Amino acid sequence: ILGLGNLGSLASKPVMEGKSVLFKRFADIDSIDIEINNDNPNSIIETIKNIGGTFGGINLEDIAAPDCFIIEEKLKQILDIPVFHDDQHGTAIITTAALINALDINKKKIDKIKIVVNGAGASAMACANLFKKSGVPQKNITMIDRTGVIFRGRENLNQWKSAHAIETKNRTLDDAIKNADVFLGLSVKGALTKNMVKKMAKNPIIFACANPDPEITPEEVEEVRSDAIIATGRSDYPNQVNNLIGFPYIFRGALDVRS
């Protein structure tokens, strides 16, 4: 549950009902919320497999990494309907679209920029993957988790984090942000400070997408940089970068073409 963590199936029901409302409101998709009171990936896979034949598609919601990767990949193999984890792919698609637009405004080339991704959960990894597919070299993306920079040789990295490890001497966000062109935050409130923003490259792009409160507010950025493009995940600030502007329509398309 956003901002609260794993509180069980009943507590998550209002969130899932809200998701159903968004599917209907934005893409005219009739959906049924199903909450599974189990956090074992194999049990979740088995449950969805057994009910999947009665649905046109499955939208996975709020499953933590790395379980979400395991569950989605397995369900894609065994079901013949769309299986979509919007926390990963919806976020990645709309963030990459925002990045392309911001780079066009700033006249920067995607294969030359330096990106810092603060957060290493499902959405952060999906964004980094799509950035790479869109032309950002892997060596130009620094990913940071609770421990610090994900670098080659760091111990206790799982296979998903290891895929984003790079050769670097930077160990903290404060180190990595120096001369960065882009900051993508999918982490926690206050993670990016005004002093860090000052260290970024000319015409920086800042996507502070932590919910419910961003890593830094637009007002704080504007206090120290007049050349920054700033977006958040909130609808009450300009430039919203939130998977709501993507996932309903992606799922609508998948259903319409019977993918």
Regions inferred by a protein language model and the residue ranges of each:
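Short, structured coil segments at secondary-structure junctions
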Residues: 27, 78-79, 137, 202, ...
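Short, ordered loop/turn segments at secondary-structure junctions
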Residues: 36-37, 62-65, 86-89, 146-148, ...
